[in-house]
């Protein structure tokens, strides 16, 4: 009798474990969402009108990107869409809103990564590409390479008929004024003092696939040819299924040295840290070496994190577990 009771109890325990595991898998599969950022820096000088413009753009982009995921679309499509929307706006330092280098030329960078197989594509120092993020995805899908730069990337864009524009498309009197101001102050912290920044997105789709994408015009008054963390896989962008997706913004040289995006996922994977702890601790540690910036992240359960150590960071999120959220400070 005791033996039969023991067997029954063991069978019930096994059944309970199976049901718990199945529920966990179902919950994970049903989780989806997207997080975006529009850059970190000194944002306190933004006018109320400008703040409203930015918040409205972020909100509209989140709603549309969320709809892609809700309808069963891929995380890759969602992050590419979100970043390209920001590239088409003059509100952010990417695409049309890109800042000038010291030669009064815009040089843009972008990268995208698929967490399902860790495939990635990136472009750097491109000057005539309307949407660098779209070209980055084409590098991923249509070449055997990860990163194309400058003229080589632009030739590839022409070959595949990606949208090419005249440099006048990126002209901005406001950004020229900022360049002149930057030349006068000769500061290493231009990217932090700028009032607009790098853009990025991370997403989890219904199939459990995570993707990340980042794009930028770089640092005002940067040396021609300077490339920051944005197109560097592991620094500005990282996506890894079953762990997390990360997009960075800030002082790119430090983010490259510390492999910030990948470090978040590494701490989760090997130290069993939560998304919030891993991402927040890294941003705090960067502050100790006077490295300014922020990150956005999403994990396999659609938990999100958006820490920063600057005056503000344009950011927002929308998941099936949480309401639409948009903030600057």
Q: What positions do the PLM features span?
A:
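Short linear motifs in intrinsically disordered/low-complexity regions
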Residues: 6-7, 23, 300-302
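Alpha/propeptide regions of enzymes that mature by internal proteolysis
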Residues: 29-329
């Amino acid at each position: 009798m005791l033996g039969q009771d023991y067997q029954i109890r063991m069978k019930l325990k096994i059944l309970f474990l199976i049901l718990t595991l199945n529920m966990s898998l179902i919950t994970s599969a049903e989780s989806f969402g997207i997080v975006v950022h529009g850059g970190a820096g000194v944002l306190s000088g933004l006018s109320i009108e400008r703040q409203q413009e930015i918040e409205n753009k972020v909100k509209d982009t989140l709603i549309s990107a969320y709809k892609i995921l809700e309808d069963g679309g891929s995380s890759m499509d969602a992050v590419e869409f979100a970043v390209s929307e920001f590239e088409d706006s003059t509100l952010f330092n990417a695409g049309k809103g890109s800042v000038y280098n010291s030669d009064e030329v815009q040089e843009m960078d972008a990268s995208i990564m698929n967490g399902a197989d860790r495939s990635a594509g990136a472009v750097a120092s491109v000057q005539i590409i309307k949407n660098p993020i779209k070209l980055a995805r084409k590098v991923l899908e249509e070449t055997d390479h990860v990163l194309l730069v400058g003229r080589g990337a632009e030739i590839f864009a022409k070959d595949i008929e990606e949208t090419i524009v005249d440099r006048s498309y990126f002209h901005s009197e406001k950004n020229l004024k900022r360049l002149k101001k930057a030349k006068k102050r000769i500061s290493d912290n231009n990217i932090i003092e700028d009032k607009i920044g790098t853009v990025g997105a991370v997403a989890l789709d219904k199939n459990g696939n995570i993707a990340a994408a980042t794009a930028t015009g770089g640092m005002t008054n940067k040396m021609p040819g300077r490339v920051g963390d944005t197109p560097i896989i592991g620094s500005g962008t990282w996506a890894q299924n079953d762990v997390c997706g990360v997009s960075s913004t800030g002082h790119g040289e430090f983010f490259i040295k510390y492999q910030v995006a990948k470090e978040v996922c590494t701490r989760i994977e090997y130290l069993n840290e939560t998304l919030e702890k891993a991402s927040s601790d890294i941003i705090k540690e960067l502050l100790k070496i006077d490295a300014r910036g922020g990150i956005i992240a999403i994990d396999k359960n659609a938990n999100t994190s958006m820490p920063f150590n600057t005056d503000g960071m344009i950011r927002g999120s929308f998941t099936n577990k949480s309401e639409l959220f948009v903030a600057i400070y």
